[in-house]
């Protein structure tokens, strides 16, 4: 693998292009929210906790080689059927430098590698918020961002194909 990278970088240098590279410039919490809608009543709720998780990624181009990637995760913990114990929302962001990667490969790096780097920060923040809020720790499961990306690409292709058929 390292021979392949070296060969690709040497070829890029011979063509006058910068060698392919990826780096983290900064990781930061962009937005944070913790809510206990039931107030004090949340601590007397009965039932089995049900943890719901919603996530999405936002990609913003900063300049020619830098991108801001924001991983937005909302965790809602309900007791029983519909009684919300608490809601935590974290927007974890990173500034990433990407050089020599373009097109679909760039989109894949920004949609998979960057969120994979940011997710441990989100997990720790949500767990800490829950504990500091007086609740049991919340241990979010690991997420396969590669599989989510493949699924999103397949859905977009299927949607484009069905739109093309409808237009024909």
Swiss-Prot record:
Family annotation (Pfam families): SecB
Alphabetical list of SUPFAM superfamilies matching this protein: SecB-like
Family indicated by similarity: Belongs to the SecB family.
Compartment(s) where it occurs, according to its Swiss-Prot or TrEMBL record: Cytoplasm
Highest taxon, organism lineage: Bacteria
Any one of the GO CC terms: cytoplasm
Name of this chain's protein: Protein-export protein SecB
Keywords linked to the UniProt accession: Chaperone, Cytoplasm, Protein transport, Translocation, Transport
GO MF term list: unfolded protein binding
Function: One of the proteins required for the normal export of preproteins out of the cell cytoplasm. It is a molecular chaperone that binds to a subset of precursor proteins, maintaining them in a translocation-competent state. It also specifically binds to its receptor SecA.
Species of provenance: Saccharophagus degradans (strain 2-40 / ATCC 43961 / DSM 17024)
GO BP, sorted A to Z: protein folding; protein tetramerization; protein transport
């Amino acid at each position: 693998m390292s021979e392949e990278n070296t060969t690709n970088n040497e070829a890029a240098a011979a063509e006058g292009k910068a060698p392919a590279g990826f780096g983290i410039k900064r990781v930061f919490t962009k937005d944070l929210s913790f809510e206990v809608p039931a107030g004090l009543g949340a601590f007397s709720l009965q039932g089995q906790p049900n943890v719901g998780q919603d996530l999405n990624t936002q990609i913003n181009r900063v300049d020619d080689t830098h991108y801001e990637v924001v991983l937005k995760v909302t965790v809602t913990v309900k007791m029983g059927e519909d009684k919300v114990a608490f809601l935590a929302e974290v927007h974890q962001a990173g500034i990433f430098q990407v050089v020599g990667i373009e097109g679909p490969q760039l989109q894949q790096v920004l949609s998979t590698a960057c969120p994979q780097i940011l997710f441990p920060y989100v997990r720790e923040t949500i767990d800490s918020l829950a504990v500091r809020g007086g609740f049991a720790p919340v241990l979010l499961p690991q997420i396969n961002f590669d599989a989510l990306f493949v699924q999103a690409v397949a859905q977009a292709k299927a949607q484009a194909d069905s739109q093309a058929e409808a237009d024909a």
